[in-house]
């Protein structure tokens, strides 16, 4: 029913069924994995009104076994890419996997899929760092350009006591540049295409 893919590795389609509605993939050597893809194989769709919540369990940590919600897949969204490179043992969320045995090997993580109602999936909040960046190259370029302009202009900053009068030179307060920078960055984060209007 499910598949799991890590770049440079074979596709896993042998999910271990640990309950009637729960499936687990072992993820060896997870420390060297940046992203994981979980998908429906296309052979068996979810029953009407159901989808799959995708969790990650990494070994270790003071709390023992911790499952972190990555996101979900459905018949309408049959695959998803999750970034796991920044996720370590730590705070998890409530999860349906109970007190399953943690992976035996210290470098073995587990990806779990729990079949749940679509209404429940919509209410859950994934770990924020698991989402793949959606910033396009233009937005990234714009942010780098803003940083460069701000850093460049700041390198010429002088206090008023250091300035010598020069009628042909115009001075702009650094606070004005900083205010423009902060406003532009805020608007860019709210709507990367705001400049088109």
Swiss-Prot record:
- List GO BP terms, alphabetically: cellular response to heat; protein import into nucleus; protein transport
Offer one Pfam family short name for this entry.
Answer: Hikeshi-like_N
Q: Which UniProt keywords apply?
A: Cytoplasm, Nucleus, Protein transport, Transport
Q: Name one GO molecular function term.
A: nuclear import signal receptor activity
Q: Which GO CC terms are listed, alphabetically?
A: cytosol; nucleus
Chief location of this protein within or outside the cell: cytoplasm
Where can this protein be found? Cytoplasm, Cytosol; Nucleus
Q: Does the keyword GTP-binding apply?
A: no
- Highest taxon listed in the record's lineage: Eukaryota
Q: What does this protein do?
A: Acts as a specific nuclear import carrier for hsp70 proteins following heat-shock stress: acts by mediating the nucleoporin-dependent translocation of ATP-bound hsp70 proteins into the nucleus. hsp70 proteins import is required to protect cells from heat shock damages.
Entry's family note: Belongs to the OPI10 family.
Q: Which PANTHER family match?
A: HIKESHI FAMILY MEMBER, PROTEIN HIKESHI
The protein here is known as: Protein Hikeshi
């Amino acid at each position: 029913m499910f598949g799991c893919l890590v770049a440079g590795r074979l596709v896993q389609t042998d999910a271990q069924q640990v309950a009637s509605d729960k499936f687990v993939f072992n993820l060896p050597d997870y420390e060297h994995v940046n992203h994981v893809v979980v998908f429906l194989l296309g052979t068996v769709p979810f029953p009407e009104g159901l989808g799959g919540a995708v969790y990650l369990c990494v070994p270790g940590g003071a709390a023992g076994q911790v499952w972190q919600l990555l996101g979900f897949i459905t018949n309408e969204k049959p695959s998803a890419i999750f970034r796991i490179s920044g996720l370590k043992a730590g705070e998890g969320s409530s999860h349906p996997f109970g007190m399953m045995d943690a992976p035996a090997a210290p470098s073995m993580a587990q990806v779990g899929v729990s079949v749940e109602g679509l209404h429940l999936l919509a209410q859950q909040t994934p770990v924020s760092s698991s989402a793949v960046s959606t910033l396009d190259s233009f937005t990234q370029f714009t942010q780098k350009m803003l940083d460069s302009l701000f850093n460049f202009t700041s390198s010429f900053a002088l206090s008023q006591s250091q300035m010598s009068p020069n009628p042909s030179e115009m001075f702009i307060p650094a606070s004005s540049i900083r205010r423009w920078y902060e406003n532009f960055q805020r608007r860019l984060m709210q709507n990367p295409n705001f400049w088109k209007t």
